[in-house]
Every structure is written in structure tokens, then in C-alpha cells.
Amino acid sequence: MYRLLIADDEMIERKVLFKTLSQNLKGQCEIFQAENGREALEIYEKEKIQIAILDIEMPGINGIQAAERIREKDKKCCIIFLTAFDEFAYAKKAITVRALDYLLKPWDE
């Protein structure tokens, strides 16, 4: 069973993504939620997360910073950014941390 983390400071976005993934993956993964980068890193460490879906703009530690810290410890964790920022500079940063994908909000189920 995969261990997946959703980190987004917007509760509605986080809950909708959680519900969508839970329904579509039906027991194939355990899903954890974080409302900021600090909490995401704590959950990552404690739960041995394999897939991290990160918003970029979060209070405190942002998604890029969280991804950088994850990469320092884990080269295999699958990192996906789900963000409203469509600027090239953010996409470039996602590439530098070897993110698997960079998806824009709003997203479709």
C-alpha cells in the first residue's frame, strides 16, 4: 500500500483532493493531509511518505522548500506540485527538485 501526502493550506482544496483520490484509489494507498509545509515535513518523516502532492504557496515553509528538504533525504519520493502559479520561475524550481509533475489549479477530477 502506498503512503500519500496532500499538503495544501486551503482546506477545501485539500478535502476535495482527498475525497477524489480516496474514491478513485479505493484502498490502494493511505492518504495523509497537511495544512502547511512544516506539518507536511513532520508527516513525511513519521509516516514514510512515498508520494507527496504539494501546493507551492503555503505559510511558513512553502511547497518548494518542503520538496527540497524531502529530496535531501529521499531521492525516490514522487513529488507532484498542484498550484495556482503558472509562472515559469515556479515550474523551473519544480524541475530542480525533480518533481514528477506540475499541475495547475483548478483541476478536474
Task: Label each PLM-derived region with a short phrase.
Residues V16, T20-N24, I43:
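Alpha-helical interaction/dimerization surfaces of two-component signaling modules
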Residues L25-I31:
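A generic structural motif
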Residues I31-R38:
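Conserved Asp/Asn-Gly motif in the active-site loop of CheY-like receiver
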Residues L41-E109:
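CheY-like receiver
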